[in-house]
């Protein structure tokens, strides 16, 4: 039993092995037959033998299907029979193209691709044929690719055909390196392809339905794919019809090749900073805008042929390859480099398309008159004979130069350097040149002439040759104390030890002297000194008649006597009277003093500044020789022991009439000290002795203009006291403990003092505004001063032949006449 069972097992084992062996042989036979079929099929494909012999089965099937589709397309189309000449030219078509040919089905399969794809993409033809295009393109381009493959078979409007043209940019895998080597497909980079073509619809010839339905027409997309070369990898040298340009990210020129001048007429310099959109034809702007959008999205574009405007009119056809250059550090876009191919000459060169093209058209043409003007405006070191020779060559220019009948010949006045210096000084006073300084403005000049105080019948007399040109001869003669010639030499006083005259030698050696004429007036800031050029004030207040550093006397175009006094319309600045001289007896032992009026009004005022009798001895000695004007300017905390007196050689001394200057009221109560000596002049007062009355019409209008200008100028300066009472002024600056307060200009009023000897004395009181009424209300030697109103001052203006203020009924009658 056991032996029989063992024999059966062996038989079964042998039978199973035979079946397996037969199965293996059958499978091997099938594979061999299949391989023979694929081998035969591969050799049927239009591929080289070395390629087809190495294809796997899947590749053979893929390529065969693609070939069958292509054959179907070719059979569906109306193909012409090629002759021998066309057959020979077929091999040159791909060489002429800057790309490869690709045919896609409606589902995106690449049924055909030319064999030169390896040259541009690194991938071979059989590696791509039959595959889906979506396997080798950028994922961001898939949606656009599907839109390009879609063909709408819906109803079409009458008279309008469906657009089958396609042009788009596609990023595809590339296995080529910059050196031309091939890399693995996994390390491939993206390369931008400019795909242009159309959708072709193939209708089958079999009109009979198959299997009960009719097949739809087959559509395919035929494309020519042109890769855009990188500017750094351009192998072919650029010809004369090509120029390079670089642009910023907003498409403005940052560089342009010089060859654009020969092609379009533009200079590279005039394009820098200008947008490229300014030079596009209007009909191509939409297409170029979309192209630039694709450039920033995909990195490279080719614009195709578009019209670019020439400089002098017309346009040229251009095709541009633009590439975005990225920064190697941060991979950010940096600039745009364009390779521009000009494919035509200038078309319609006489047609204007933009405003830039009108610049050359509207350029003015030079005429003979312009040439003549250039001869005069051109500055050359040539003599007049050479100029005449040039004009002689232009007959029209000579006729224009010749004067016609009735023409007014104006002689040229070539001023000296002094005139230029004077004009420069006048320009330094742009604001305050209405009264005091000659105005360079014609309007101000006309106003000043209209406001002149001189009557129309009175004409200014010529000036003396040895006098100041700014002074009128008639006024200068009145200012002369003696019959000798008036020699005025305006100098800048300097500190010196020797006296200027024998009469004041004892005092000038010990008394400090101002360093500059501006210190005679008042202390101002450096900025204000620059604004107020006090040349006239320096001349009027100059002490020394000996010329040390003489100023250059310059002729002025406008005489100051033609300038009218400034007449304000408000109550802040009112007209004041001229010096109204009253008789005063020379033998009066105790002349009236104004100090009593000031001593009674000390309410919260600074301490009184006094002057001893010894300090006024020199003043008493010279009281009968000249005007004695003592001005005190409190500036510190001590009082000097000596005063400064006037020089006897002052050109303004003598019996003359003048108008007191306005005063910068100080901070302190003024005390006039004449108690020690009966004939000494009053400190801080103006004493005009031995004077003859002169009518107001003969007063110096230049001094009037100076006074009005100073009264008009509103300045606030701490610790300054400026008192001016005419010409020939002597300054004394004792220190005062008074604090600095704000000062304001006020009216100057004259008071009549009693006398016995007929001498005329005038006291000018200059006071702060807050003490005006109280000072005027004080009594002087038992008789009170009348409190005057604004009408009083207006009515009591200087009247010819009148020396007294109106009182009582006379004042009322005068007011009635005014009203």
UniProtKB/Swiss-Prot annotation:
Chain intervals for the UniProt region annotation (Interaction with TSGA10): 1-402
Protein's UniProt name: Hypoxia-inducible factor 1-alpha
Transmembrane parts of this sequence: none
Biased amino acid composition, Low complexity: 582-613, 632-655
PAS domain mapped to chain residues: 86-159, 229-299
Modifications after synthesis and translation: S-nitrosylation of Cys-793 may be responsible for increased recruitment of p300 coactivator necessary for transcriptional activity of HIF-1 complex. Acetylation of Lys-533 by ARD1 increases interaction with VHL and stimulates subsequent proteasomal degradation. Deacetylation of Lys-702 by SIRT2 increases its interaction with and hydroxylation by EGLN1 thereby inactivating HIF1A activity by inducing its proteasomal degradation.
Domain of life: Eukaryota
Pfam families xrefs: bHLH_HIF1A, HIF-1, HIF-1a_CTAD, PAS, PAS_3
């Amino acid at each position: 039993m056991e032996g029989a069972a063992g024999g059966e097992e062996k038989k079964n084992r042998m039978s199973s092995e035979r079946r397996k062996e037969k199965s293996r042989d059958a499978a091997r036979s099938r594979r061999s037959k299949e391989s023979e079929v694929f081998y035969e099929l591969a050799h049927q494909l239009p591929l080289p033998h070395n390629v087809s012999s190495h294809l796997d089965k899947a590749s053979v099937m893929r390529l065969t299907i693609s070939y069958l589709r292509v054959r179907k397309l070719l059979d569906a189309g109306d193909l012409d029979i090629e002759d021998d000449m066309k057959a020979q030219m077929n091999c040159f078509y791909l060489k002429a193209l800057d790309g490869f040919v690709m045919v896609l089905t409606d589902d995106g399969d690449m049924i055909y691709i030319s064999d030169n794809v390896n040259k541009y993409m690194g991938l071979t033809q059989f590696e791509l044929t039959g595959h889906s295009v979506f396997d080798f393109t950028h994922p961001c381009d898939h949606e656009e690719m599907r839109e390009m493959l879609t063909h709408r078979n819906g109803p079409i409007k009458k008279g309008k055909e469906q657009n089958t043209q396609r042009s788009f940019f596609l990023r595809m895998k590339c296995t080529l390196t910059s050196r031309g080597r091939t890399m693995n497909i996994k390390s491939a980079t993206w390369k931008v392809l400019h795909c242009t073509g159309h959708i072709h619809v193939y209708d089958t010839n079999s009109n009979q339905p198959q299997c009960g339905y009719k097949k739809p027409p087959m559509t395919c997309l035929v494309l020519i794919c042109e890769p855009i070369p990188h500017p750094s990898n351009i192998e072919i040298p650029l010809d004369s019809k090509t120029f390079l340009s670089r642009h910023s990210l907003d498409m403005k020129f940052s560089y342009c090749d010089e060859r654009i001048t020969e092609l379009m007429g533009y200079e590279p310099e005039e394009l820098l900073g200008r947008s490229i959109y300014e030079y596009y034809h209007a009909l191509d702007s939409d297409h170029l805008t979309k192209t630039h959008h694709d450039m920033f999205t995909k990195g490279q574009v080719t614009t195709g042929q578009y019209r670019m405007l020439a400089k002098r009119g017309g346009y040229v056809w251009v095709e541009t390859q633009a590439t975005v250059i990225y920064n190697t550090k941060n991979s950010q876009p940096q600039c745009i480099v364009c390779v521009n191919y000009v494919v035509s000459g200038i078309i319609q060169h006489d047609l204007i398309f933009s405003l830039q093209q009108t610049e050359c058209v509207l350029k003015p043409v030079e005429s003979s008159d312009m040439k003549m003007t250039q001869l005069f405006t051109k500055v050359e070191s040539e003599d007049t004979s050479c100029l005449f020779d040039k004009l002689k060559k232009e007959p029209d220019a000579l006729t224009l130069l010749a004067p016609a009948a009735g023409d007014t010949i104006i002689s040229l006045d070539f001023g000296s350097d002094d005139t230029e210096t004077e004009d420069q000084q006048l320009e330094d006073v742009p604001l305050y040149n209405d009264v005091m300084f000659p105005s360079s403005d014609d309007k101000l000049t006309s106003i000043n002439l209209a406001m002149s105080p001189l009557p129309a019948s009175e004409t200014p007399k010529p000036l003396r040759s040895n006098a100041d040109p700014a002074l009128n001869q008639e006024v200068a003669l009145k200012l002369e104390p003696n019959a000798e010639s008036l020699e005025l030499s305006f100098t800048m006083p300097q500190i010196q030890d020797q006296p200027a005259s024998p009469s004041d030698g004892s005092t000038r050696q010990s008394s400090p002297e101002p360093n500059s004429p501006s210190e005679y007036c008042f202390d101002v800031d450096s900025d204000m000194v620059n604004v107020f050029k006090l040349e006239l004030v320096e001349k009027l207040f100059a002490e020394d008649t000996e010329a040390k550093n003489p100023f250059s006397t310059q002729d002025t175009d406008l005489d100051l006597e033609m300038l009218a006094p400034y007449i304000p319309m408000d109550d802040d600045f009112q007209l004041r009277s001229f010096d109204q001289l009253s008789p005063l007896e020379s033998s009066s032992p105790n002349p009236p003093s104004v100090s009593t009026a000031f001593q009674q009004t000390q309410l919260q005022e600074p301490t009184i500044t006094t002057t001893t009798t010894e300090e006024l001895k020199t003043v008493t000695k010279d009281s009968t020789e000249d005007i004695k004007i003592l001005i005190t300017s409190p500036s510190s905390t001590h009082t000097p022991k000596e005063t400064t007196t006037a020089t006897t050689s002052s050109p303004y001394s003598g019996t003359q009439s003048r108008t007191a200057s306005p005063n910068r009221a100080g901070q302190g109560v003024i005390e006039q000290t004449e108690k020690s000596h009966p004939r000494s002049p009053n400190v801080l007062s103006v004493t005009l002795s031995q004077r003859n009355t002169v009518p107001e019409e003969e007063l110096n209008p230049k001094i009037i203009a100076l006074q009005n200008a100073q009264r008009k100028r509103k300045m606030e300066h701490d610790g300054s006291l400026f008192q001016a009472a005419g010409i020939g002024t002597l300054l004394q600056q004792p220190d005062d403990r008074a604090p600095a307060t704000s000062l304001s200009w006020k009216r100057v009023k004259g008071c009549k003092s009693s006398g016995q000897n007929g001498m005329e004395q005038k006291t000018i009181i200059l006071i702060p505004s807050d003490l005006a009424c109280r000072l005027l209300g004080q009594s002087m030697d038992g008789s009170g001063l009348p409190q005057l109103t604004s009408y009083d001052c207006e009515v009591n203006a200087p009247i010819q032949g009148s020396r007294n203020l109106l009182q009582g009924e006379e004042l009322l009658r005068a007011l009635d006449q005014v009203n």
